[in-house]
From Swiss-Prot:
MF GO annotations: ATP binding; ATP hydrolysis activity; DNA replication origin binding
Protein name per Swiss-Prot or TrEMBL: Replication origin-binding protein
Record-linked SUPFAM superfamilies: P-loop containing nucleoside triphosphate hydrolases (SSF52540)
Family: Belongs to the herpesviridae OriBP family.
Pfam families: Herpes_ori_bp
Keyword Repressor part of the UniProt annotation: no
PROSITE patterns in alphabetical order: HELICASE_ATP_BIND_1
General function of this protein: Probably involved in DNA replication. Binds the origin of replication (ori).
Residues reported to bind ATP: 52-59
Amino acid sequence: MENRFQNDTLFSEWFGQSLSDVRFPDNVTVYSQADSAVSFENVRQPIKLVRAAMGSGKTTALIHFLKQVPRELSVLLISCRKTFAAEILHRFTLNGLKDFELYCDITERQINNRKVIVQIESLHRLTENYDVLILDEIMSIIKQFYSKTMTKTKEVDCKFLSLIKNSSHVIAMDATLTRHVVEFFAAFKPDTQIALIRNTFVSAMFSNRIAYFCDTFFGKEFSFFARLEDKLRWDKKLCLFCSTVLAAEYMYDLIRSRFPLKKVLLLTSKQGKCSSIESWIRYDVVIYTSVVTVGLSFEPVYFSSLFVYIQLAKGGPDMVSVFQSIGRVRRVIDEDIYIYMNPVLIRSYDPLAPIAIPPCSDWSVAEQSIISESCIDFRGKCSGAHKYNFCSVLKSLFRYRHYIEKTTITSLSDSLFLLCSLLCENSIKVDIVGNGFPMRKEVFLSFLQILVEECHFIEKKITLPGDDMTFQEIISSRETIMNGDFYENGDQLLHKDYITDMGKFRATFLSPGVDIFIASDIVYDLKNESKRYVFVNVWLQKCVSAGVESTEIERVFCERIKCYMLPKSFLCDEYFVLGDISGVYEWGMLIDLAFLAEMIRKDLKLKSCTDTTTDISEDDLLLCAARRSSDILQIMQLVFTVHVQFFQKYSLQTLQLFNKLRGMRIVTGVFSIEKFSISILRLFFKCAFNMTLSASRPRYIPGKAYRNLTKNDMENMLDNWEISRTNLKTCKELRKALTEASRARRKQTIYKLQGSDISLSVSEVGVFGQHASPGVCVSS
């Protein structure tokens, strides 16, 4: 029973499908609505929790309810997104609810208006409690507590709980509302009656749809792009969702090259936030990413088909976000959705473990037991987050769901299973190469294998260097003049504050030998979030290495990094925050990561965690993994949402099943402790510092590349090896002799880190001193 529970109900438990067979607390009354849209008629309980699919009339029922609320009662609606809040206000206004105000239209810092629509991140601005509280898309609201944009987590959490406690009427709605939400309300307000409305009605505009999963992108009649081309040749209007900007740009270029006369609209984060979709009817193809999500709905009967390109990638949108974005087009004429998953970026033989398997009828008991063990291990590591001081009750209560969402991104089988479950729950039929869902395991595994074998890389666009001058060129040029606050050289402008900003950054964070021009190059790289994350981890690890107390590190981190502003360009018209990094971590997780990184650095005898010059012996790697594997696997899950089990769990049968679920080649050899140790350390360095741990041969001189050996170096080495160098006069002759002699001597395998050694530039922080004055002198 434990195996079945773990395998069959992990997703249903956390994404709402299990509400039909749960025993709820005594103050919860369950209402079932199956044949009609959501309705609050005859539901008298003051707290109403609604689980209903997209297109089931939740918003319509809400508007009807609000029209009956006495005017003297105050009403607050909390949304998960600013665009969603604006769309709700628009719908309210169209339906006669004209006394609501949008929080971003209120100029006063403190909000005490009687009827307000507010986005969750701005909840701390509210000064009053409200009689009626509306939580539309409550799971998305809770999800925002994990967003990097949630800068006042504690204040928002406290206000959120206060609003629930003091409101006389609460309505919370979501398509994936879970029993944990019900239990939270029941425990938080035990003396209040609660109605759980389970509405299973789905309008025909969703229930008649079929989602066709394509196993290839190119290459055959029913491939993803072949179907798209066929639709366009018939002059069909298409909507295409892409999970990443890279995929969206790729599809945009591909469609434009094949169909140059078609009008194609591209909507990604590079074009800015999408606040309106009314203009879509002017285009033949609309390509959008998750910038179009909850709250924006395209209602006209215009698009014939919906295409979905999912590029699975660490840090990309999870399957719930994908599912929500798919539902933005409310009416599809041909009632078909074509979905392609590209797993090329998560293809790996590292021992990543899935956490669930689809409910195929023919899984063996052994296979179910393997996944059950993985699921139990996953839950155990996630529960380790208890030790951290979460500043949010909501984050603590719902962290499992967030870990599931983020962990499944790097698992092909988990992502496919979860997306299919969400589609089926919304009464959208699933077709995987002619098979419904769920299906026989061999069909499922075969589909995964073809996906992996036929997947393709998307080449990133390379931006060729233009005519723009570098910081150093502008400052050094004799033709540069001072024009007001700007240094000017032809069309090139550089604000004087940029020099000051670079000087301050250099003095605060960088080593004495780093000049202001290198500092400018580093700041340019830090515009990339992944580079910022590495910088933060390096800085923290160096603090630990210098023996700084964790409380002092936290203080300086908050003062110098978390809110440190850097210019996006020479013009200093826009700034970004150095501490603007995504993740599910708390401060305690970051500092634990830094302490673990320092212990690993010492074990491997590295100068830093980005040291590219030191050879790492295999013995040191194995000893480090033996000492630190438990801590590494815990941090990998809690900080990086990467699920790896302990070595003892990886039997040959386990590896074979995991590789099948990844669509990879079946393993025939033994998975040794050496391979496991190298794998987990490779994952750690890649996730924490973007460094690649690779096998190599020992360097001739530690810390010195072969190509940099001098004639004297080579002569000394040959003498030490007792190799005659008679008649060896030139460097070429010495190098050849050294190479031949080393073949018999260099049999040992060593490892080294490859990547950018940013640690060389980051300052030692033992006393948190500054190495230079904030500015530089620039002659005119």
